Design a protein with these regions (language model features):
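Extracytoplasmic
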Residues: 9-41, 61-64, 160, 348-356
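Extracytoplasmic gate region of multi-pass secondary transporters
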Residues: 28-32, 236-285, 324-381, 414-416
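Central cavity-lining transmembrane alpha-helices of secondary-active solute carriers
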Residues: 47-74, 372-385, 516-519
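C-terminal ends and interior cores of transmembrane alpha-helices
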Residues: 90-105, 409-423, 440-444, 457-469
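Intracellular juxtamembrane helix-capping segments at the cytosolic ends
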Residues: 124-138, 349-352, 485-500
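Glycine-rich segments within core transmembrane alpha-helices of 12-TM secondary carriers
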Residues: 141-172, 198, 506-521
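C-terminal membrane-cytosol helix-exit motif in multi-pass small-molecule transporters
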Residues: 164-173, 192-219, 226-252, 296-316, ...
């Protein structure tokens, strides 16, 4: 492995887009809840908003691959990483414009389409940005540079909501009711600013002299077998998802909604308590088979991805011709790892609120600081991992590995307090941060070793989370954010190791697997309806078992190929 010097000028320019990804997400955190209220969306339509965003990543990366297969060259590599990011930003700006027009004209389908276009742009940006990060220095330290980008992204995600809240409400503390009562003119102005940010960053990148083009016009062999495999997986996923979405408009679902409306009308009268109890019992009888049916289809969707990728792995090993980037086993296993990692990270974050509500009897305002700490934990870990992206003395790195996570923890608590939340119950979480610091020392800045250690810690955390009670279980589940924080860069760099001219194509395949965020979280949600919210976190444990195995296997695979990531 070469010891190529890091191009810091290009690196610092590139991380600006990571910051604005996080900052723009803050705009969405206001815009999307407003749209849900403004359009008076039912449960089905609300699910469509979340699904459209994740599915766009899958579709965008698949379209890039189809174009590349048809032309015999990877479009991102041909355009260059720099131009691809610019095109992605402009594409997202068009989507932002479509969302603004749709909201102004009260057209929900148009807003949904606009959000889909925004996410398609993100798909192109991330397909280019991650291998771009790796290419700016030694391939073996690429995970550190991706961690730096992730840390800056988390910073944007953390401070963005405060800036948006101050700009719109004049206060850092914002409730869901505040968002719902926003004037249409303010919301449209907010997203106009988001659209202008897309254009502004595109201009920054387009005219930057520090960023190399990142072009690679080398021809790549056709990947017809990989395309056929992915199209089959896509078709089967549509078959699995269609019944889930149609179930929200089924006769049983409509009956449930009608009975819930009846309960709302009767709740004000004490004399109607018996009638309400009967209606609630009817809802349970209607909902149970409906939820079980949805869980079956979501489970089949998960099986389609897992089995489809494993079958592709088996066939590409027998004859690598026609598989493109998927001829490399580390990539296919990495695709499954990204799918599972994104799924478990989003699943724990999405279901944490429900756990705190039912097991700890907390209300929405009391849950908010815990949710902020979970997502803030991602920033804590990424900041610590990013230390190794800089050429510092070993002693300095050792000191910063201790200091940086503690400072980041203090910043997360400070910003959460600034938003008007009580953080006194979160001080003891510093113990979890210290455990993460120990994990970094044991990992020795080696991606496979670090991934294995943090996957094991994630496994332990989820097991403690669903087997204990009280604040111990809460801290354990919160710490999943700490242990997930380094997984994206580690999986990315290990999966793309040794791919050469197929690196951009491999990156697109990995981005496709963000789809895990659309399958695993609702699967846990449906499981919780059947066995309870706390036991449902066993799904996280299963995910971390695979990630541990992946870290062990991929290290051996790369060594056999003469690649040393240690």
């Amino acid at each position: 492995m070469s010891n190529e010097k890091t191009n810091y000028g290009a690196l610092f320019t590139l991380i600006t887009v990571f910051f604005f990804w996080g900052f723009i997400a803050a705009g969405n955190s206001v815009f999307i809840p407003f749209c849900k209220h403004y359009f008076e969306l039912d449960q089905f339509q609300s699910q469509l908003i979340d699904f459209a965003f994740y599915f766009a990543y899958y579709v965008g990366a698949l379209v890039l691959f189809i174009i590349g297969t048809g032309k015999g060259s990877d479009p991102v590599a041909k355009w260059g990483y720099k131009n691809s990011i610019v095109y992605g930003l402009l594409f997202s700006a068009i989507g932002a414009g479509a969302m603004i027009i749709s909201v102004y004209n009260n057209v929900f389908t148009g807003m949904l389409f606009g959000l889909f276009i925004v996410a398609l742009g993100f798909s192109l940006q991330q397909t280019a940005a991650n291998p771009f990060m790796i290419s700016l220095g030694d391939e073996s330290t690429g995970s550190n540079r991706i961690s730096l980008g992730g840390g800056i992204n988390s910073l944007g995600t953390t401070i963005g909501p405060l800036v948006v809240a101050l700009a719109l409400f004049g206060s850092a503390s914002v409730s869901e009711e505040d968002i719902q009562s926003l004037g249409l003119d303010k919301v449209i102005l907010l997203y106009i600013c988001v659209g202008l940010l897309f254009v502004g960053i595109a201009a920054l990148f387009g005219f930057s002299k520090k960023l190399p083009s990142g072009k690679n016009e080398e021809k790549i062999e056709g990947a017809s077998k990989a395309l056929r495999s992915l199209l089959i997986i896509t078709g089967l996923l549509i078959v699995c998802f269609a019944p889930v979405f149609s179930s929200y408009k089924s006769e049983k679902a409509i009956q449930i909604l009608n009975k819930e409306e009846q309960i709302k009308k009767l709740e004000s009268l004490v004399s109607n308590s018996n009638t309400i109890a009967i209606l609630e019992n009817d809802i349970i009888k209607l909902r149970e088979p409906l939820e079980q049916e949805r869980m079956v289809w979501l489970s089949l969707g998960l099986a389609v991805v897992v089995i489809g990728l494993l079958v592709s792995l088996s066939r590409s090993k027998k004859n690598p011709t026609g598989w493109g980037a998927m001829q490399y086993p580390q990539l296919i296993l990495g695709m499954l790892a990204i799918f599972i990692y994104v799924g478990v990270e989003v699943a724990v974050g999405s279901n944490l609120g429900e756990y705190l509500k039912h097991q700890m009897n907390l209300n929405a305002s009391q849950i908010a600081p815990y949710a902020a700490l979970y997502w803030g934990s991602l920033m804590i870990g990424r900041w610590a991992s990013a230390i190794h992206a800089f050429e510092l003395k070993e002693k300095t790195k050792h000191i910063l590995t201790i200091v940086v996570p503690l400072v980041a923890f203090g910043i997360v608590l400070g910003l959460t307090s600034l938003a008007g939340h009580d953080v006194s119950n979160l001080y003891a979480y510093i113990v979890c941060v210290v455990i993460q610091i120990v994990g970094f020392y044991l990992g020795k800045n080696k991606p496979a070793r670090t991934l294995m250690i943090f996957s094991l810690l994630g496994l332990i955390a989820t097991v403690i989370g669903f087997t204990t009670v009280g604040i111990v279980s809460v801290y354990a589940l919160l710490s999943v954010g700490l242990f997930c924080s380094i997984m994206w860069p580690c999986i990315f760099s290990l999966s793309l190791g040794g791919l050469g001219k197929y690196q951009a194509q491999g990156s697109a395949f990995l981005i496709m697997m963000i789809l895990g965020g659309a399958i695993i979280p609702p699967l846990q949600g449906k499981l919780s309806d059947i066995i309870g919210i706390q036991p449902s976190f066993i799904i996280g444990s299963i995910c971390f078992i695979y990630l541990t195995v992946f870290a062990f296997i991929v290290k051996r695979m790369l060594n056999k190929q003469g690649l040393n990531f240690e």
